[in-house]
Amino acid sequence: MARFQTVTKHARFVYSPYSATEMQGFAQVLADSIRARIQGGQNIYDQAAAPLKPGQSGRRGYPDYKSARGLKPIRDWTWSGHTLRCLKVLTANENRAAIGFLDEALSGRRQTASQIAAFNNRREAQWGVSPRDRQAVLVAFQARPFVMLKAA
């Protein structure tokens, strides 16, 4: 399987003081922050996500199956890890960068990572930018040296 490469384009009109590679870096900071938050079992409001539903009438439920595999029984989008591994910076140019899920299906499955993410996000809003994610990107923006030019 070929490794994914972010598509870096150059815009015809540039409104931003950042290069395409800098925008890709900022988007990667955001993607890493979102991935860490989802793996921590938090929603887009930086609160604990709703608990998983237990089994009914003496049957084992999804939390029981996750515990049996050695995983945390919380809503963290991890079973095989494929969905969160597909969270990438898809495109970047001087004006904007887009993050999302690759349209790859794990072998033996019908649904792609983006379909699984959309389905999981309908249950509990975890895919999106939380206040802590926004703060992480602002720190990355402010860490970049800013140069002001004065008119003579």
What is each stretch, according to the model?
Residues 1-152:
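Short, Lys/Arg-rich flexible segments
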